[in-house]
């Protein structure tokens, strides 16, 4: 699986060289390429932003360098070329372009699993007041464009979100996580939060591990864990519980 990230701070992505994703990159399971947006500027000042039409605070990222950068990224990936009529493209025909933004759709575990089945994912990391809106419509000629948000808060740029999404998607690629079973029992995989976990010693500072986990009865353990998932989700994430309860 290939990721391409376009940013004005390429060094921000260096953390992808460590831990499980770093190993996955070295083993060829996940391929990550980071591109400096300033390399696609055409003026001697390497300008990537300008003042907004209509006035207002801050600066807006210019469309010209983004177009050149995204054309370059689209040409590098393994996906099939875009069809002549983008509207007729089937899902999976084009690489996915993720644009982190507080005004995007929510990035979820289900979304991550969907992306893990794709060959090529690009991420456009905006800064300042964002990227010129025209870029997104134009990019649909080359990509399946998805504007995404990690949550209801604002970050300084898209790099933190890019790191989170690459890890969320990359760890679902076969071989990245050593024990595939651990992916099945995590929070959000079945619409619920994960159950609490414990390890040795059985009694620590007067706090004991729930007896059912020491019983050796796999059926009782499974039932206890399911109850804990439901109670934890109902208490901590009523929004998830409402969605789960309506499907049940």
UniProtKB/Swiss-Prot annotation:
Species in which this protein is naturally found: Micrococcus luteus (strain ATCC 4698 / DSM 20030 / JCM 1464 / CCM 169 / CCUG 5858 / IAM 1056 / NBRC 3333 / NCIMB 9278 / NCTC 2665 / VKM Ac-2230) (Micrococcus lysodeikticus)
EC identifiers of the protein: 2.1.1.228
Molecular function GO terms recorded: tRNA (guanine(37)-N1)-methyltransferase activity
Record protein name field: tRNA (guanine-N(1)-)-methyltransferase
Function: Specifically methylates guanosine-37 in various tRNAs.
Record key words, sorted: Cytoplasm, Methyltransferase, S-adenosyl-L-methionine, Transferase, tRNA processing
Membrane-spanning intervals of the chain: none
Family under the similarity heading: Belongs to the RNA methyltransferase TrmD family.
């Amino acid at each position: 699986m290939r990721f391409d990230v376009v940013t004005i701070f390429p060094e921000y992505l260096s953390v992808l060289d460590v831990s499980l994703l770093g190993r996955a990159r070295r083993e060829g399971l996940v391929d990550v390429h980071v591109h400096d947006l300033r390399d696609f500027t055409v003026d001697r000042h390497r300008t990537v932003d300008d003042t907004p039409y209509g006035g207002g605070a801050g600066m807006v990222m210019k469309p010209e360098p983004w177009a050149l950068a995204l054309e370059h990224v689209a040409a590098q990936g393994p996906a099939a070329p875009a069809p002549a009529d983008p509207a007729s493209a089937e899902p999976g025909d084009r690489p996915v372009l993720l644009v982190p933004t507080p005004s995007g759709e929510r990035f979820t575990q289900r979304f991550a699993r969907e992306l893990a089945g794709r060959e090529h994912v690009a991420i456009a990391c905006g800064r300042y007041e964002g990227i010129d809106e025209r870029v997104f419509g134009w990019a649909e000629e080359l990509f399946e464009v998805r504007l995404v948000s990690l949550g209801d808060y604002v970050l300084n740029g898209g790099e933190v979100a890019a790191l989170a999404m690459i890890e969320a998607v990359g760890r679902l690629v076969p071989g990245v996580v050593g024990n595939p079973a651990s992916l099945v029992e995590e929070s959000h995989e079945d619409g619920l939060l994960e159950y609490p976990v414990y390890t040795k010693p059985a009694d620590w500072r007067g706090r004991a591990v729930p007896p059912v986990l020491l019983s050796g009865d796999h059926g009782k353990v499974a039932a206890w864990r399911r109850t804990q998932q439901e109670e934890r989700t109902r208490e901590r994430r009523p929004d998830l519980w409402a969605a789960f309860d309506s499907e049940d």
